Amino acid sequence: MNLPNIPENDSQPRHLSDLVVDYLELLGVEYVFGVPGGHIAPLYEALERSECRGGPRAILSRQESGAAFMADGYARETGKIGVCCSTTGPGATNLITGIASSYSDHVPILAITGQTILPKFGVGAFQESSPDVLDTTSMLNKCTRYNSVVTHPKQLENKLIAALKSAFQSPPGPVHLSVPVDVFRSPAPETISYPHIRQLLTKPAFADLAAIEKLGQMLEKLSSQNRKVVLLVGEDCGEASSEILAFAELMGAEITTTQGGKSCINPYHPLYKGVFGFAGHQSARQALTDSSVDLILAVGTTLGQWATSTWDRALLNERLVHIHHVNSYFSRSSMGQLQVYGNIKTVFQELVKRMKSSLLVGKVSQKEGALEDPNSKEKPPQIEVQKPESYYSQETPIKPQRLIYEMMQRFPAETRFLIDTGNCMVWSFHYLFLPHPENYRSSVELAAMGWAIGGSVGTAFGRPNTPVVCLTGDGSFLMNGQEITVAVAEKLPVIFIVLNDRSYGMVKQRHRQVVKEGLEFAIPTVDFCLMAQAMGANGYTIRKPEDFDKVDYCLLYTSDAADEKGRVG
């Protein structure tokens, strides 16, 4: 088999770095995000050659963690593997937070780091991070699905394939290869050994049929007694959303979600009652604690602190059935009746098939199961939010609830929303509702500040000509805001909304709740509008609701990055 798009008259010598890029091209990967350096230079040279023939190209981030966040955003948007790279030493260590974030959120990314030449391992070479010295590979052991140093040129292809396969296994996640610069420059074969690599990355559709049979019997008994089942949908349910909704409609089961699961269920479905747990809705808690509920199906959730409302017995009790494709999480549901291990889509396909054969009709009629308004930009009527009147507040400084409302009103349905860590998450969990829930993205496990900034850039690369909104805080922006220059340079339609309360607000509020003392955790006054303009973006300051009319929203369709600063009270 000829390598991807290589001209037949190309007499330039091929290196193993070219082989890596060839595999990325076979997988449809368009970009590699990273910061260059001497020990990773051969990969950049290969990407330059690739770009000239229309293949994958390099995107230069401003810091390596930003590159990892971009790869994460690209992977979430496209379903492909996200790829990031760095040089050895500090370049590799800067990647760690981004890699750990993807590990916690089950996002497949390939991280490639350069390394000192093999003969100089252990002798103190510049920025050496081999297993004999700093050992960045060991640092990444606990946040990767595959992690290896390539110590011979003949290892590279097989280790690359092993890494790619591991990235898409259950659970998916980041993988890492540390490649010495002399290995990268070694001669490459003219053909590749795994031309059908896509087939090797197919996710297995496995399921514990015995556990499904037992759950089916429990559901049939419950239905015959007119007792209820309620669902808690977690962050790992995206591929099974339609099957879960079909099951819920068949059973008449109300649906709640975790914070991450918010992206899996349309909030305008009449059975949806909102988010349970941290920053959630009272209507969701009422659904779970209803005395007529005999089973709670917790699906695709890690049952962590936020998702369980700090391990609340309202959820974690003997009514619980835990369904997940990662069996290590079952240690968190020992109080429940049953654990069902398997591909979530497969599990619910089997449950729907079984319940259709045992029930004469579904509990929810077609009319009742229809969306309240598939194009609505208002709060879903069946979800109870705190102070709903704050959506329309005219106060100055502008209230976060009003900002969220304006976001719902002003951006088109296809807009992607990436929500950063901090109070941004709190407001979005509770007040932001999208008729296309899959367009809502957050990172709720590691919850690294600044994830959404790099992630929004990667998302924009993955979905050209589609508006992307990043909601972030002033603290996060000061950590990672330099990545806006990538959006500017590439003319990406991204709008960065900065909640400016001049403090690490979430930390300050939590500290006051616990300690009752007034530590401010203050951030000095920064003019983010001027900061954005200095980086080449359009900048707007939003102090009152009328200021939203100053923003040129046409920029989202002309591939010009924008920055919008909101000072919130």
Stretches with model-predicted labels:
Residues 254-260, 422, 542-546:
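Beta-strand->loop->alpha-helix junctions that form or flank phosphate-binding loops
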Residues 363, 367, 564-565:
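Intrinsically disordered, low-complexity polyampholyte segments enriched for Lys and acidic residues
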Residues 2-358, 413, 486, 493-496, ...:
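N-terminal alpha/beta PP-like core and its mobile active-site loop of ThDP/TPP-dependent enzymes
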Residues 198-206, 367-396:
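Long, charged amphipathic helices and adjacent flexible linkers at domain junctions
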Residues 17-20, 25-27, 38, 43-48, ...:
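Active-site diphosphate/adenylate-binding microenvironment
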Residues 299, 323, 419, 473-474, ...:
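Active-site flanking residues adjacent to catalytic metal/cofactor-binding acidic residues
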